[in-house]
Amino acid sequence: MTEQTLVLIKPDGVSRGLVGEVLARIERKGLKIAALELKQVSDELAREHYAEHADKPFFGSLIEFITSGPVVAAVLEGPRAIAAFRQLAGGTDPVEKAAPGSIRGDFGLETQYNLVHGSDSPESAKREIGLWFPEFPVA
């Protein structure tokens, strides 16, 4: 079954020149890039995207980080796209939990500055794609 997922290359990935590397890994995995856009994230979009973390102590720094520079947003499609990208990304903590060979394992150093975001469920993917690509047809 074909699935959709939202992927963000966060400001640290963009500023470090890793966009091409991340997109190449996505394509080598066999996922289709159905939509792609470089954008400066508004405070409003950041707060909507990370709404589930609003009551957590790191929320303010998370919003500050994601709005600190351009982000590459993409919609990926493919069989088990959500799990496939999350495997490619590696664990959230790039030093302790991300396997070597994953994006975070190879390039990440800190939990907050972990280069990429990928939707964690079909429900999250639908919500996130609707936020980042309001005109895009969500499956």
UniProtKB/Swiss-Prot annotation:
Enzyme Commission code: 2.7.4.6
Any one Gene Ontology BP term: GTP biosynthetic process
Class of this enzyme: transferase
GO molecular function, one term: nucleoside diphosphate kinase activity
SMART domains in alphabetical order: NDK
GO cellular component assignments: cytoplasm
Catalytic reactions of this protein: a 2'-deoxyribonucleoside 5'-diphosphate + ATP = a 2'-deoxyribonucleoside 5'-triphosphate + ADP; a ribonucleoside 5'-diphosphate + ATP = a ribonucleoside 5'-triphosphate + ADP
Cofactor(s) for this UniProt protein: Mg(2+)
Domain of life: Bacteria
InterPro entries: NDK-like_dom, NDK-like_dom_sf, Nucleoside_diP_kinase, Nucleoside_diP_kinase_AS
Stored SUPFAM superfamilies: Nucleoside diphosphate kinase, NDK (SSF54919)
Positions of ATP binding: K10, F58, R86, T92, R104, N114
Subcellular location: Cytoplasm
Catalytic residues identified in the record: H117 (pros-phosphohistidine intermediate)
Entry keyword set: ATP-binding, Cytoplasm, Kinase, Magnesium, Metal-binding, Nucleotide metabolism, Nucleotide-binding, Phosphoprotein, Transferase
HAMAP family, per database record: NDP_kinase
Self-association and partners: Homotetramer.
Family of this protein: Belongs to the NDK family.
Function: Major role in the synthesis of nucleoside triphosphates other than ATP. The ATP gamma phosphate is transferred to the NDP beta phosphate via a ping-pong mechanism, using a phosphorylated active-site intermediate.
Stated name of the protein: Nucleoside diphosphate kinase
Organism the protein comes from: Nocardia farcinica (strain IFM 10152)
Gene: ndk
